[in-house]
């Protein structure tokens, strides 16, 4: 493995402040290098962080190349310019090229500590498998959703998102910060083991594959007219079958899941997703058997 530099990003969304605090503990000279690998720790969206908001003009994590934001607002939105800067500075062909990007996020949903992957890149599978094997973390595999594109880690040859919640926006939670610190330390250790061929992959990777998203009930004006059903609150990753309640509207009517397939919900009630008209996303569970090629692909970095 020839990885020489790894990018650790916090504050991609400016009001997700816990990973920024955790990263400060690592962004010191003694932590910059580990066994020949240089770690770059940056705040993804510093202006939004200063203002305590998610973004200035557009979601930075939807503003990299191949996104609608990038195509339509290349020269006018702060976030698209920031995305270009990050790629020019830290992209594989940048002035400080990084082979791997790790993007740290929090959520107001009860997701626990989880991994988010975008697509089925073998290098990403390799890194995610090691973390899942060590901590038992659930994996949300997001793919084939044309409404959501341009994610940060997709701009690097290898990368994943660490998502931790539930925690309110702009609220420091020591337990959440400790979880980020543990994950960052473990990632550094696992990458070091990979570099020295001291690792064995688990036999399989369990993923929850994105299938779609569900909006809140709405009235004729388009305003939200229902709440997440009490039985569904804080039940991320818990299976839903036909007939299970999803929402309770203003008339007291229960809106039930009417699909025939079993689904597993994620990001239930995520505050930031209201503007995207998403009350929750739903997934199907899939088991992917590990392949030696994953390690070979990772070693090629």
From Swiss-Prot:
Binding site for Zn(2+): 13, 16, 105
GO molecular function: aspartoacylase activity; hydrolase activity, acting on ester bonds; zinc ion binding
Cofactor: Zn(2+)
Pfam annotation, one family: AstE_AspA_hybrid
Gene Ontology, cellular component aspect: cytosol
UniProt catalytic activity: an N-acyl-L-aspartate + H2O = a carboxylate + L-aspartate
Co-factor remark: Binds 1 zinc ion per subunit.
HAMAP family per UniProt: Aspartoacylase
Family: Belongs to the AspA/AstE family. Aspartoacylase subfamily.
Protein name: Probable aspartoacylase
């Amino acid at each position: 493995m020839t990885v020489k530099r790894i990018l650790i990003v916090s504050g991609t969304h400016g009001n997700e402040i816990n990973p920024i605090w955790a990263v400060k503990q690592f962004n010191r000279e003694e932590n910059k290098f580990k066994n020949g690998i240089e770690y770059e720790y940056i705040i993804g969206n510093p202006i939004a962080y200063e203002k305590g908001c998610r973004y200035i003009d557009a979601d930075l994590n939807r503003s990299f190349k191949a996104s609608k934001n990038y195509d339509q607002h290349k020269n006018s939105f702060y976030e698209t310019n920031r995305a270009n800067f990050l790629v020019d500075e830290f992209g594989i062909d940048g002035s400080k090229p990084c082979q791997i990007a790790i993007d740290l996020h929090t959520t107001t949903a009860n997701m626990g500590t989880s991994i988010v992957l975008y697509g089925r890149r073998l290098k990403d599978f390799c890194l995610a498998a090691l973390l899942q094997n060590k901590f038992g973390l659930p994996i949300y595999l997001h793919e084939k959703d044309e409404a959501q594109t341009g994610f940060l880690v997709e701009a690097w040859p290898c990368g994943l998102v660490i998502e931790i919640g539930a925690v309110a926006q702009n609220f420091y939670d020591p337990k959440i910060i400790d979880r980020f610190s543990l994950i960052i330390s473990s990632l550094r250790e696992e990458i070091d083991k990979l570099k020295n061929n001291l690792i064995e992959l688990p036999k399989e990777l369990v993923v929850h594959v994105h299938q779609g998203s569900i909006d809140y009930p709405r009235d004729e004006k388009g305003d939200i007219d229902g709440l997440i059903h009490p039985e569904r609150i804080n039940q991320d990753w818990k299976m839903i079958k036909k007939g299970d309640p999803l929402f309770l509207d203003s008339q007291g009517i229960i809106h039930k899941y009417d699909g025939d397939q079993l689904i597993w919900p994620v990001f239930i009630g995520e505050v930031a997703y209201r503007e995207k008209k998403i009350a929750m996303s739903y997934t199907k569970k899939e088991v992917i058997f590990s392949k030696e090629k994953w390690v070979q692909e990772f070693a090629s970095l």
